Every structure is written in C-alpha cells, then in structure tokens.
Amino acid sequence: MMLEQRERFMEMVKERGLVRGDFTLASGAKSTYFFDLKMVTLSAEGAYLAGRLVFDLLRDRGIDAVGGLTLGADPIVAAVALVSHMEGKPIPAFIVRGEMKEHGTQKAIEGYISQRGSSVAIVEDVITKGGSTLKAIKAVEEAGCQVAKVVALLDRHQGGSDELRRRGYDFTAILHADAAGEISTE
C-alpha cells in the first residue's frame, strides 16, 4: 500500500509540483526547474498522501510532535497530525516561524511542543542545501527538544541531505530528484 501511495504521490508531484523555467532557489542557487510542492500538499489527495507517507515513517518511533519551518512544512505537519489521529496514534504539530514575532507572545514556535526533552520530527517539502531545515532544527533544539527524525517529501540531492547526515540527523526522503529534475522513489 505504501509503495502505491508513494507512486501516486510521485505522479502528483510530476503533474502539479514540477515547473520548468529559470528560477532562483531559497539557497540562492539557479535552476531550470522548481518544485512547488504546495500545489500538491494543499490539494485534498496530496495532503492525505503526504500525511500518510510521513506518518508511516514516524509511526512507533516515540515521536512527541512533528513540525517544520513555515510555509513549506505547514500543510505537511497538519496532514501528519490528522492522519496520526485517524490511526489512533496522535502526533501533534508545530510550526517554526521564519522570523521572530514582535508582538503578542513573540514565539519562535507555534503549536505543540510538550516539554523540554521532547522527541520531535522535522519535515520539509523540498530539501536543496538544507538551510530551511537546519533553521527549524536550531529553533527546536534551542527550545530543548531532541530531533529524532528529519523527513523531506523531495530531496534535490544538492547537499542538504548529506549535510544533515553529516551532522548526525536521521534523514529520509519520500522522493528524489536528479540534476535534470527527473523524479524517482529511490
């Protein structure tokens, strides 16, 4: 079942999330293709599949909460929380702000992180160099949490996943892209 869901998710990314053209990525790198996975994760089926695929990786790992840097992680963490509830194994969600809020509670993290020492998973829509992921990791570690797992929906294989592993994080990608933007499940 998970393989069928991964294949369907890959089809959706190819159909809705892959855009060809000239782009500057968040890392500053230039690219002839761009993955706009919000076009997938904000659809009903895509949200379900993303939530299901990530939840299946986190199930039975003792994860206390799942989160990531806004905006790419937002629909993913909500989908994981929903799927986990449907499975009777609720994993609450949190979102790491890109910039510190200067009014109200001035929180760097919104949502649920239970306490210092919590075991959390960080999710990302697309990982390139890893800057956004590392920013989220830094915020949750500064809040006293342990990062037990890092999951990206798609790895562009441009150094980010290698850097996370080099730093000792347990990283998994659902899909992979090569230098030409071709997507695979391996």
Where do the protein language model's features map onto the residues?
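Active-site-facing substrate-recognition patch
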Residues: 1-62
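PRPP-dependent phosphoribosyltransferase catalytic core
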Residues: 2-12, 138-186
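Solvent-exposed alpha-helices and their adjacent loops that cap or buttress functional pockets
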Residues: 27, 111-117, 143, 163-164
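Short helix-loop-beta connector
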Residues: 59-64, 114-117
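Short acidic, glycine/proline-enriched helix-loop-strand junctions
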Residues: 61, 76-91, 163-178
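Short glycine-rich phosphate-binding loop at a beta-alpha junction
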Residues: 62-72, 149-151
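Short, glycine/charge-rich flexible loops or terminal/linker lids adjacent to PRPP-binding catalytic cores
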Residues: 77-121, 129-134
